[in-house]
Amino acid sequence: MVAEVCSMPAASAVKKPFDLRSKMGKWCHHRFPCCRGSGKSNMGTSGDHDDSFMKTLRSKMGKCCHHCFPCCRGSGTSNVGTSGDHDNSFMKTLRSKMGKWCCHCFPCCRGSGKSNVGTWGDYDDSAFMEPRYHVRREDLDKLHRAAWWGKVPRKDLIVMLRDTDMNKRDKQKRTALHLASANGNSEVVQLLLDRRCQLNVLDNKKRTALIKAVQCQEDECVLMLLEHGADGNIQDEYGNTALHYAIYNEDKLMAKALLLYGADIESKNKCGLTPLLLGVHEQKQQVVKFLIKKKANLNALDRYGRTALILAVCCGSASIVNLLLEQNVDVSSQDLSGQTAREYAVSSHHHVICELLSDYKEKQMLKISSENSNPEQDLKLTSEEESQRLKVSENSQPEKMSQEPEINKDCDREVEEEIKKHGSNPVGLPENLTNGASAGNGDDGLIPQRKSRKPENQQFPDTENEEYHSDEQNDTQKQLSEEQNTGISQDEILTNKQKQIEVAEKEMNSKLSLSHKKEEDLLRENSMLREEIAMLRLELDETKHQNQLRENKILEEIESVKEKLLKAIQLNEEALTKTSI
């Protein structure tokens, strides 16, 4: 089941386990992470806990008591009723008062979906607690002690490495390299690396020496291990890599070095968190910016289907939400429970984030509307319409021209038929017309006879011819004006197309310039990293040289002391011999 959604409470607002410290006594440190390392045990002088309170707690918790408190295990008395259930009302009040510690402290609450923390009960932060080793002197042999404390002369270390196996493990499966890297003893680390010890050995929590060095923020040891080929993609029992711990510690230098040596920027831990999602979850804004520049996947999902944007909204981090929205992330993506980032913001009452999301949606809608109303498409439509008009006008002109000879032919045929019917001019037609009809061969004889007539023999008046010629002139003028208009429109289309081509060329040039800038930026970053590594190497060489000088001075002092002692012994012996004589 997916837990209810609410915003993560601030560290100051989280209630610590309400009176349980004083009443539980010594068990408080074992069960509650908030009490570990605080130095305030709240125990009396006897160091015992309040038995009466523990009895009431057992009776109310029932069967969950054995899971949660070591003092109840193996007692044989479960204090469970006949139903075998615990007091739900008591557990509800306990959860509400304890807040986020409830899921860490009580196994009965883990995975139940009834956490009062909302989404934050899902992730176990115990992987990032107590990064340094807890070391007891009696559990370590000579080599491991020397690696941990680092206050042993180099000669003695070399002798130890000859006599013992440098890859030997202690009870917690730690090698000398683990201990030296976790405690920042770079001289011991360098000596072990020069002797070619195993780099990727796992301790009892499946962590390598590189992971421990990153976790404990020992930068010098990290660089040494990476230079000698340590694997940065090995996952511990929580699924975290060295990059996860660098992001959690907000150590940009270590993150850069790990990525430079091939660390996977998209590796997921057991909670499904990539380094970017972990940075968002822990509200590490500077590291999130760095990972975005390194092109981390902004659409990666955790095990509950939540994106970086949804996690940022649930955390209530408006700055990270704004940073992600600048990268044009998908606002409408849903997690496994079917909720979006906006729904989480509304349910958590994050008004600033709601405004950011609504403004972003409005901008996206405006972009989509502007893309739909594309000027290129409008120009194409106008050019197509104009070409169709031109075609129609061209088709109409030959039709008019072809109709005129057909009308003339029909008239000539009618005249010939009338002549044949009435014989020799009964209607009183002019002689030249009948002679032309009889002398001509069919239609061809009539048409030239019409053309050769003089003005006095014409049947139609001059006004009709003038009107006909004026109509022809008007038609030609119209055609010329249409041709001029089409020519102007074509010129406009050509100019628009030229403008579009120029705009497209400018866009291409800008994109190319941006890509060149990005490449230059990447090259600069690589050169900067190489310079930083070179500077670190120089510092390491200087420290080595200084240490060698110190060792030489110490050896000289030891030899001088030995000589003085030998002289003193000789003098004492001579004095003894004299006294005996």
UniProtKB/Swiss-Prot annotation:
<dbReference type="InterPro" id="IPR050657">
    <property type="entry name" value="Ankyrin_repeat_domain"/>
</dbReference>
<feature type="repeat" description="ANK 5">
    <location>
        <begin position="304"/>
        <end position="333"/>
    </location>
</feature>
<dbReference type="Pfam" id="PF14915">
    <property type="entry name" value="CCDC144C"/>
</dbReference>
<feature type="compositionally biased region" description="Basic and acidic residues">
    <location>
        <begin position="377"/>
        <end position="392"/>
    </location>
</feature>
<protein>
    <recommendedName>
        <fullName>POTE ankyrin domain family member B3</fullName>
    </recommendedName>
</protein>
<dbReference type="InterPro" id="IPR002110">
    <property type="entry name" value="Ankyrin_rpt"/>
</dbReference>
<feature type="repeat" description="ANK 3">
    <location>
        <begin position="238"/>
        <end position="267"/>
    </location>
</feature>
<keyword id="KW-0175">Coiled coil</keyword>
<comment type="similarity">
    <text>Belongs to the POTE family.</text>
</comment>
<dbReference type="InterPro" id="IPR036770">
    <property type="entry name" value="Ankyrin_rpt-contain_sf"/>
</dbReference>
<feature type="compositionally biased region" description="Polar residues">
    <location>
        <begin position="476"/>
        <end position="494"/>
    </location>
</feature>
<feature type="coiled-coil region">
    <location>
        <begin position="489"/>
        <end position="577"/>
    </location>
</feature>
<feature type="repeat" description="ANK 6">
    <location>
        <begin position="337"/>
        <end position="366"/>
    </location>
</feature>
<keyword id="KW-0677">Repeat</keyword>
<feature type="repeat" description="ANK 4">
    <location>
        <begin position="271"/>
        <end position="300"/>
    </location>
</feature>
<dbReference type="InterPro" id="IPR039497">
    <property type="entry name" value="CC144C-like_CC_dom"/>
</dbReference>
<dbReference type="Pfam" id="PF12796">
    <property type="entry name" value="Ank_2"/>
</dbReference>
<feature type="region of interest" description="Disordered">
    <location>
        <begin position="369"/>
        <end position="494"/>
    </location>
</feature>
<feature type="repeat" description="ANK 2">
    <location>
        <begin position="205"/>
        <end position="234"/>
    </location>
</feature>
<keyword id="KW-0040">ANK repeat</keyword>
<feature type="compositionally biased region" description="Basic and acidic residues">
    <location>
        <begin position="401"/>
        <end position="412"/>
    </location>
</feature>
<feature type="repeat" description="ANK 1">
    <location>
        <begin position="172"/>
        <end position="201"/>
    </location>
</feature>
